[in-house]
Structures are given as C-alpha cells and as structure tokens.
C-alpha cells in the first residue's frame, strides 16, 4: 500500500485524505490559513501513514503559501480536478485541459450570453476586471457573514481594508487583469485552458448558457449558485481526479475520505469515497454526503478526524 509508509495500513483509518479550501479549511477567502487545530489533525493523519491532498477549484498558485509548504501535503488536485500535481514527486502528475477549439467556443459563448469571468490556464490566471469587481463584492459579503459566524464560534477572521477592489482581488488571487478573457486567451496560443470561473447576469442567462454548453458537449459544469457556474473539461472533476489518484497510487477508494461544502465538491460523492459535508455546507451537499461534521469556524475537519485518529484537540495557547 503506497501511503507514506509511516505506519502499517492496519493501524490507520484511511490511506488518503482530501479536503476543499474555501468553506472547508479556509473560513474566508481573504484569510488563506488553516487553523492550528486543523493543521495538527492533518499532520497527525500524515504521521499515521495517510497521504493528504488538497482538492480545490483554485489553481496551485492561488491556494496560499501555508498549504503548499505544509510537511503533510502530498498532492494538489486543482482547478476542479483539471490538473493534479505531486508536491513531493511528479511522476503521478496528470491533467485534463479543455481542447483549444472548444475552449475558444466556450469563452465566446460566455461573452455572448453576457457573462464575465476568469480563466485559469496551465501557467497563469487571467481575470476580467469586471469579474474582479464582482468578486470583491462577494468577498465583502462573505466576510460580513464570516465575522458574524466567528463571533459565535470564537474563531478569528481577517477583514482588513484592501484599497482598490480590482487590485486587491488580483493580488489576493495572484491573477493578471484583462479586459476580455477571450481576447487574452487568443493572444496566448500555446496555453492550455484548465478552468473558467464565470458570473452570469441572471439565473436565466446561466440556464441558457448551460443548456447551450450541454448541447455542445465536452464541457464539465459545476454550479456554485444560480448565477455562478464553473467550467472544465468534461473529463475533469474533483471526484474523477480523486478516484484516478487512488488508482495510480493503488489505494482502494473506500480507504479515502474527502471533505467539502459546495457545488464543486459534489463530484466526490457516490464514488466509494467517504464524503463528509461541513456543517456550513449547502443543503444539496449535506443531502449527498456520507457523513457530516462541524462548520469550518468550528474546525470541522479536525473534529471529524480526531476521534478516528485517536487524538485529542491541541490545548489552546494562553
């Protein structure tokens, strides 16, 4: 069994642990840090011999500085499964980008239906400035909710002023601002398109775009809310990538556990993997999950792992 060989298989409850970021281990996108309790639980899981993977909609350069440098991280499933990389070894890296002709049609249709968005290629993120303004508004609303939830859970949050909203979003997510993601992609003929984050002007326009793309074929769709779809290759999803990673590692999916809270985590359900919904997950995610834990503000990943690993929560520092 090719876990990290720290302990025999019989002594550990899982061989692979995967976790989403925003709403799962990040209480706010503005604060890209794992809490000390969750960090300790993931370290304990790794020490038991389990492999640990992040499973995010973000590309690798958007997941912050702490997680890529964590000694317990082995793999990064990025862009909703479009690209998987090893943080310690590269022989198992794989990707499913959208073929360029199809990618160009996708971006043209988003524009035609009035949408705005950001694209993540194999080397960079190109974010429409209109989309950055929308993201800034969403972050402010999320921070307001996070502050309220944290006030009840005792968890700290980061809600500092960030100046110009477009520049703040580009800095936070390590992106480059563009006027048109289609024009920017056409100007980079060697790049591969892994994922598109999209905001539509209405749920009706999102429905029409998704219907058109479904008719076109070849596009994977994860709907975060009524107006916010995410697009990848049809071959890419977090769940498909996690199962493929298990196959390449020789791990039986039933020996894997995954944590998530939103629409792009649903693909990890129903694949033989134990999927655990966060307490703050959407109703749809909770209904599909195998189990449920506490909220992200209550360190839900840790509270689920600790009893199964036979460890106690670390004592809070004075």
Residue spans for each PLM region:
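Mg2+-dependent phosphoryl-transfer enzymes with acidic/Ser/Thr/Gly-rich catalytic loops
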Residues: 2, 8-16, 35, 214, ...
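Short, structured coil segments at secondary-structure junctions
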Residues: 69-72, 79-80, 216-217, 271-272, ...
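Conserved acidic, metal-coordinating active-site core of Asp-based
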Residues: 113-116, 120-257
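Short active-site oxyanion
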Residues: 48-53, 73-74, 195, 254-256, ...
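Active-site T/S-Asp motif of two-component receiver
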Residues: 19
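Active-site phosphate-binding/coordination module
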Residues: 36-159
């Amino acid at each position: 069994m090719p876990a990290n060989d720290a302990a025999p298989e019989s002594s550990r409850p899982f061989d692979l642990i995967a976790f989403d970021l925003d709403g799962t281990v990040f209480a706010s996108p503005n604060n890209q840090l794992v809490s000390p309790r969750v960090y300790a639980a993931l370290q304990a899981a790794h020490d038991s011999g389990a492999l640990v993977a992040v499973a995010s909609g973000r590309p690798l350069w958007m997941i912050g500085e702490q997680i890529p440098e964590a000694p317990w991280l082995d793999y990064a499933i990025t862009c909703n499964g479009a690209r998987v990389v090893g943080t310690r070894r590269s022989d198992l890296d794989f990707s499913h980008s959208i073929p360029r002709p199809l990618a160009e049609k996708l971006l043209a249709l988003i524009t035609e239906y009035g949408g705005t968005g950001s694209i993540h290629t194999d080397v960079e993120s190109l974010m429409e400035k209109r989309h950055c303004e929308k993201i800034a508004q969403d972050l402010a609303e999320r921070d307001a909710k996070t502050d309220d939830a944290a006030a009840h859970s005792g968890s700290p949050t980061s809600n500092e002023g960030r100046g110009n909203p477009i520049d703040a979003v580009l800095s936070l997510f390590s992106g480059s601002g563009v006027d048109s993601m289609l024009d920017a992609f056409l100007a980079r003929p060697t790049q591969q398109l892994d994922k598109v984050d999209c905001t539509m002007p209405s749920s009706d326009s999102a429905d029409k775009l998704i219907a058109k793309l479904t008719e076109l074929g070849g596009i994977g769709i994860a709907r975060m809310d009524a107006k916010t779809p995410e697009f990848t290759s049809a071959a890419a999803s977090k769940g498909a990538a996690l199962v493929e990673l298990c196959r390449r590692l020789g791990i039986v999916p039933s020996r894997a556990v995954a944590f998530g809270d939103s629409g792009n985590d649903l693909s990890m359900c129903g694949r033989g993997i134990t999927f655990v919904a966060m307490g703050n997950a959407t109703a749809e995610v909770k209904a599909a999950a195998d189990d449920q834990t506490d909220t992200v503000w209550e360190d839900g990943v840790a509270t689920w792992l600790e009893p199964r690993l036979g460890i106690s929560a670390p004592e809070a520092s004075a």
